[in-house]
Amino acid sequence: MAKDRYVGVVPPIVTPVDKFERVDEAALRGIVRRCKDVGLHGVFVAGSNGECMALTQAERNRAIRIVLDEAGPDYPVMSGVMDSSTQRVIDNIKALEDMGGDVAVVTPVFYARHATQDETVRHFEEILRHTKVKLMIYNIPMFTGLNLTPETIIRIAELDSRVIGCKDTSGNFPGFQKLLRHFKDSDFILHQGSTNLAAASMLLGADGFVPSLAPVFPKVHLKVYQFGKAGNIAETMKWNELLSDVCTLYPMAKSQTSSTKYAMSKVCPMSYRSILPTEPITQSEMAQIDALMD
């Protein structure tokens, strides 16, 4: 059952690259090993934090292939397949199927124009018709231009049992609560994508959250998950105060990915280079992150 496997603290891992913007295989394998070793419940590869749309298609697929291989069959991996048209997403999923992946994370289409709610339902209908893997809905309006309503997410979930869940990074907590009420006691997985809402979401019945800094600060993220899942309000809020401090790291560089990559480089051997045209992290920004981590 998917709900026994794809829940918990599942970070969207960064993609380490060399000066030619090719995936650094050894470093990426090291990130996956760290996630496993510190007790995180799985990984999300080729997400926004993994610079999925900045990588070339070949390098994006290579990153997914490396992560699936390093994770092995027993460690959950969710793979980003988001793209600008339905057929492109289908092609990405077929490549994922060939690599042995079993969960594809799918957003509404984007770039040329913003999709509507109905178009996004049709997007998922067509994907389901032509692919075999499980699908995770990804609501991230800051990048797609469309905030999926709870009603649309419910419609998509009802299309097929292969739609196993939703990662909601909309920041719309009332909408997320509506989903929690609707899917209570079901097998549908609800992941909170906004870390600042993780504690409240866990206490109200979420199945997990997807924080990019979890491999850097695993204990605080796992404690919020564990105590939130157990309904221990006092302990959840105590650990959430520390989590709020951790989250001040995100805006310390001009790009959240740059901040996260630099922080990751302090716990895993890897370059903190971001993909062009992202501005490189500065010495003063690094000093702020060093001070927080020390």
Give, region by region, the residue ranges found by the protein language model.
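Catalytic alpha/beta core domains of metabolic enzymes, predominantly
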Residues: 143-244, 250-251
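Alpha-helical structural signal in soluble globular domains
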Residues: 38, 62, 66-71, 95-99, ...
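Active-site beta->alpha loop and helix N-cap motifs at the rims of alpha/beta catalytic domains
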Residues: 3-11, 15-147
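C-terminal alpha-helical cap/extension of soluble enzyme domains
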Residues: 8-14, 38-40, 203-206, 213, ...
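Catalytic cores of TIM-barrel enzymes
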Residues: 2-5, 188, 264
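Secondary-structure boundary/capping positions in well-ordered alpha/beta enzyme cores
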Residues: 74-75, 134, 163, 186, ...
